[in-house]
Amino acid sequence: LTCNTCAFKTCANSETCAAGKNICYQRKWNEHHGERIERKCVANCPELGSHDTSLLCCRIPDCN
């Protein structure tokens, strides 16, 4: 599985997930400088945090 790994709205960077990490993850939240985005491979989909504006977990290549 490959997942996007950049912190921007459009993403050209992806990585091959390590063994056991078969979920692509994207989390968004707001900071003083605007919206922040985190993307990576994970083993389990995390809970939506109190400051998160959205959370996406998926198993299709580069779906995050």
Curated annotation (Swiss-Prot):
One of its GO terms (cellular component) is extracellular region. Gene3D superfamilies: CD59 (2.10.60.10). Disulfide bonds join 3-24, 6-11, 17-41, 45-57, 58-63. Coiled coil: none annotated. SUPFAM superfamilies: Snake toxin-like. InterPro entries: Snake_3FTx, Snake_toxin-like_sf, Toxin_cobra-type. Transmembrane segments: none annotated. GO terms for molecular function: acetylcholine receptor inhibitor activity; ion channel regulator activity; toxin activity. Expressed by the venom gland. It is found in: Secreted. It holds the Pfam family Toxin_cobra-type. Keywords: Acetylcholine receptor inhibiting toxin, Disulfide bond, Ion channel impairing toxin, Neurotoxin, Postsynaptic neurotoxin, Secreted, Toxin. Produces peripheral paralysis by blocking neuromuscular transmission at the postsynaptic site. Binds to the muscular nicotinic acetylcholine receptor (nAChR). Belongs to the three-finger toxin family. Ancestral subfamily. This is Frontoxin V.
